[in-house]
Amino acid sequence: SGTSGGVWGEEEGYCLMVGGDKEIYEICEPIFEALSADGKGYGYMGKSGSGHFVKMIHNGIEYGMMQSMAEGIEILNQKKEYNLDLTQITELWKSGSVVRSWLLDLLNDALKENPNLDGIAPYVEDSGEGRWTIQEAIDLDVPAHAITSSLYSRFYSRNSDSFSFKVLSSLRNQFGGHNMKKSN
């Protein structure tokens, strides 16, 4: 199955996107329910391969969401005349804001730990799902501007010194335990 939840899933439960034989799914359903977040974070997606396909697209969406969050935080960070407190802002946005989300919670946690993201290189890896999502979009003639742009931004980060890329690297570490490249 396609599985989401990162390092948090072990304690909070996972989101399981299951593909395969429907009869086997039904036999295993109690296991999926037990592993899932709130006993609801699982579902049958269809034939074999469909669960991983849905998870791949999920990760492409995640790329775009994280990129827009990183860009917005970069704009706030660059507006020096206001001396904005990014930790306070992300804490505020967690309550009632349209952009509230688990990713925002994780960004707030990262900023609480390290407000300037000191020591984090602005270098963002990709683990393949964004590339595969874009290839599917190309094959299906579906425009995927945000996902494509977010992947290309990750490529660009490898030759950059931008705060937004430190945000992205921190987010990947927060939700998935992905390695962060440390700055020299």
Q: What function would you assign to each model-found segment?
A:
Residues 33, 40-55, 67-184:
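NAD(P)-dependent Rossmann-like dehydrogenase/reductase catalytic/cofactor-binding core
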